[in-house]
Amino acid sequence: MGINCLNIFRRGLHTSSARLQVIQSTTPTKRICIVGAGPAGFYAAQLILKQLDNCVVDVVEKLPVPFGLVRFGVAPDHPEVKNVINTFTKTAEHPRLRYFGNISLGTDVSLRELRDRYHAVLLTYGADQDRQLELENEQLDNVISARKFVAWYNGLPGAENLAPDLSGRDVTIVGQGNVAVDVARMLLSPLDALKTTDTTEYALEALSCSQVERVHLVGRRGPLQAAFTIKELREMLKLPNVDTRWRTEDFSGIDMQLDKLQRPRKRLTELMLKSLKEQGRISGSKQFLPIFLRAPKAIAPGEMEFSVTELQQEAAVPTSSTERLPSHLILRSIGYKSSCVDTGINFDTRRGRVHNINGRILKDDATGEVDPGLYVAGWLGTGPTGVIVTTMNGAFAVAKTICDDINTNALDTSSVKPGYDADGKRVVTWDGWQRINDFESAAGKAKGKPREKIVSIEEMLRVAGV
């Protein structure tokens, strides 16, 4: 990096014009485009910028605002998880990174165009669809996805009109992962605990009128296979005025298996057994009801029918027995999946992810031939598994692969590439995002919250000055 570049970086002149001067003055030969400004994209950018001196990284994001699931997926009462935004911000302010918000792959720009303009393209646009139960009546108004519910209270543009019906007593959540527990906690938490978070105002208003008293958390398998983690369960058990009720029969013989379990699973199971032993000592006006060994069978107005299952080699096999649960509102939380946004992407529609080997996107599935210069990271490549640390490690690995391919000349970077052409596009730069950030922070401060998110794309663009 040249002296001028270092001076600009040290002075902290992270405006778009300063960044452009740095990029032009050092005349880099390697241009890399990352599509998606979520955790996978930022972690990959962080490592690439560290390992490749002579490169420019452009991050293209379909929304005006960055951070993906950290902004729109992490529960509002988990602000400590959102601290990773500070790390992403440092990466975004690197003088060799440019942010292009409000640019959608497949609509505003094609993959072919990006490949023509960059030496390498890394797809990290995540998983924005949810898996279906595939049951009759699933399209009823009282059946919604946990993903949409999370987007609703987190202010994802387009989710503000979801209007979940919270006028009934009973809610059934199908699935037992951490997202399902987050949703249960949001439904059962005292409103005062949420007022100081960045929960959207319209969600707070709806929750203030909620009549929900009982939340069933239903899973196909048993306690030893529960997908939620100990942190999320502890939070549920500590909720004021909420009585957690386990079914004793679900834990038959479980205590005899404790010594065989790995430490994380053992600690989680011990906490469930402790809670089971103590249940009934504290009475609350609301109830959290985890139910195991039940598979969705049918949906009817006001209720849901489940098949009783039994475990056969860790798999849940339905029996002839059934159970019905009162369900004024049903939330499915059985996994996310990605979508194919451009015809140039080698997409596995069955698995809902991009065909790849260790982050290199395949050109030919049969032979395993990779498509040089085209990569994938995050949930788009792996499927929706793990937590942010999992995504970080995966993104670092793919970023290292990109660097290795460039350094070993497996990827040809000898030709000059122009980078993205933003002329005529309503692009939100990093400066524009900072204006949105300042606006949201000020609006939140006036209400005693960390921020009040803008939920309209047009309003975001207006505040950004686009």
From Swiss-Prot:
EC number: 1.18.1.6
Role: Required for synthesis of steroid hormones, for olfactory sensory behavior and completion of the second larval molt (a steroid mediated developmental transition) and pupariation.
Organism: Drosophila melanogaster
GO molecular function: ferredoxin-NADP+ reductase activity
Family per record: Belongs to the ferredoxin--NADP reductase type 1 family.
Amino-acid positions noted as binding NADP(+) in the UniProt annotation, renumbered to this chain: 176-179, 220-221, 232, 386
InterPro entries given in the database record: FAD/NAD-bd_sf, Ferredox_Rdtase, Ferredox_Rdtase_adrenod
Subcellular location: Mitochondrion inner membrane
Pathway: Steroid metabolism; cholesterol metabolism
GO cellular component: mitochondrial inner membrane; mitochondrial matrix; mitochondrion
Assigned keywords, A-Z: Electron transport, FAD, Flavoprotein, Membrane, Mitochondrion, Mitochondrion inner membrane, NADP, Oxidoreductase, Transit peptide, Transport
Cofactors demanded by this protein: FAD
UniProt topology in membrane: Peripheral membrane protein
Expressing tissues: Expressed predominantly in prothoracic gland of the larval ring gland and nurse cells of the adult ovary. Low expression is all adult tissues examined.
A Pfam family annotated for this UniProt entry: NAD_binding_8
Protein name, as recorded: NADPH:adrenodoxin oxidoreductase, mitochondrial
